[in-house]
Amino acid sequence: MFKFLVIVVFVFSFSFSNNDNVYSLISNPRNISIGKIHASIDNISNTFDSPILLNNNNNIYLSVDRYTNLYSVYYLSYCIYAKNQSNLLLGMVRREINNNFNTNSAWEDDGYPDLEDIDYTQIYNFSDKETGLLIAYNRLIDNNFIMGINFKPIFHRVDNISSIGFSFDVRYVIKMKKNQISFGIDNILAFKKWDSGLLEKFDLNGYLATAINISDRNIIFYEYNMANGSKLGLETKIIDNLFIRTGLNENDFTFGFGLQLKNIDLDYAYINNNSEIFTNNHSVGFNINLDN
């Protein structure tokens, strides 16, 4: 019955897609650089993107996404505990959109205004800040079959209006010798309740992804996501600790690199949005292992 329910919810999620919130963004620069794919890797940098298994507690992850001067997104993840069969992770995401202008009181809304009708003294700058707290529980259900559940409270303030919301995800990863399959159901029961009285709801979203090791040094990634369609990516190991990546989806061309050091992993992604508004963006992330 449980398996049937999972299949029904997953199929239903592919019928609707409208998920514009801070959790809808891919957080790991590695996954961004391969086309913004939910690729699974047992690293705390994947806390927001897919289920993971960890072998130690002392892992901290920090990343920053910079979208020109329009907005920035910050991610922080920490492992609360990690065992052979399960782990519990805590994450925080913060999106800040600055340099917004409120013109509601600058003129009377009776059509297109003449320049002399605009009172520029009534135009003021305001910010849009959204903060999410992620509680991720991952468990090994069977050999190479991982299940993850994400609980996602969210707080959002736009100018002088605030909201509080909640949603959760159910995600799975199946690992095989040379490839893996992952799929997820996101934004389950997602909503925001604004202090203005508005109840904002978000539709279910789903994805299905695969990664295939075509050689010892090359991995091909593919994902179909209801929000963004098809995505394709490639990761190549140049030397033991250096990786080059590239990806493509319907909106972006991406590439980047990864460098694995003794105590720190560094990942960088460059995003060409093909957009005059967002132009080209950058994402950088650090995974710090405190055990070594």
Predicted segments, located by residue:
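Sec-dependent N-terminal signal peptides
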Residues: 2-15
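Subset of outer-membrane beta-barrel
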Residues: 18-292
